[in-house]
């Protein structure tokens, strides 16, 4: 069955739009490789790029559940597996390019993974996502049974944690994107925890969703400031003030707040019209 068909074999516009989005980063990477635009260390840049896109798509897959509920887009479930498999394939390429960069010397590769803790963490996450990728098909769902399959795929949460930690550690001082990615991941986990702790038949009110985004964004600002204090002994208050000086660029916390504003706006737009309009009661 073609990738742009749904499970019933019908053409799916959503899948047809998603497929080129998933392939676009790889096409761009090939183009920049052929035009020698990957910088002074093209192999290293390629390794980092495919790994980063793998992590981005992993988080995009985790976004499907909240957007289905908050945005009332039930059809999004149709592309969750596609996004997850794409994340796994980018991670496969991530390791292949690393092996190529080590001149195909598997002894060196094993030694590096064993001796460098950030590579050990990354490889552990890689093994996990390979298991999830290999079982992301209807055959494995039938073989394992629905309950066992779902329990297995809950491993995506610790895998994502390891992936974010690996990204932080290999980034060293360039932690801008790892910080906002971590902030968004924290919100995704908080959202799931809320639904687990307070099961509801319907979605949480939008003011609750917006409040959680605000809190996680504030936490992102604070943790970034704490990181600067630990690394450079920069006063936390001064770092927090600098977050509101856009001449130095937009800091990670703003990305988290921006994502929260977008999710909340989508949720508001998708509300039934009667829920959006103020309700007036006649005077008694």
Mark where each language-model region is:
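Membrane-embedded alpha-helical bundles that constitute the cytochrome b-like, heme-associated redox core
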Residues: 1-284
């Amino acid at each position: 069955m073609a990738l742009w068909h749904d499970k019933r074999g019908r053409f799916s516009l959503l899948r047809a739009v998603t497929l080129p989005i998933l392939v676009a980063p790889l096409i761009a990477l090939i183009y920049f490789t052929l035009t020698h635009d990957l910088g002074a260390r093209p192999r290293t840049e390629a390794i980092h790029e495919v790994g980063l896109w793998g992590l981005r798509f992993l988080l995009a897959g985790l976004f499907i559940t909240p957007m289905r509920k908050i945005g009332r887009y039930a059809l999004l479930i149709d592309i969750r597996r596609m996004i997850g498999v794409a994340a796994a394939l980018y991670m496969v390429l991530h390791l292949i390019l690393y092996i190529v960069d080590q001149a195909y010397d598997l002894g060196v590769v094993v030694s590096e993974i064993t001796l460098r803790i950030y590579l050990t963490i990354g490889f552990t996450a890689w093994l996990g996502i390979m298991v999830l990728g290999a079982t992301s098909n209807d055959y494995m769902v039938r073989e394992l049974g629905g309950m066992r399959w779902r329990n297995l795929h809950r491993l995506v949460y610790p895998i994502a944690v390891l992936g974010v930690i690996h990204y932080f550690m290999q980034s060293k001082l360039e932690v801008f994107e790892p910080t906002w990615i971590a902030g968004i991941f924290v919100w995704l986990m908080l959202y799931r925890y809320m639904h687990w702790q307070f099961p509801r038949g319907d979605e949480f009110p939008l003011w609750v969703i917006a409040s959680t985004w605000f809190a996680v964004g504030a936490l992102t600002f604070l943790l970034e400031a704490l990181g600067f204090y630990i690394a450079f002994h920069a006063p936390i208050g001064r770092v927090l003030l600098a977050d509101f000086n856009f001449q130095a660029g937009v800091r990670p916390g703003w990305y988290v707040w921006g994502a929260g504003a977008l999710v909340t706006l989508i949720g508001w737009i998708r509300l039934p019209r009667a829920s959006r309009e103020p309700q007036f009661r006649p005077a008694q």
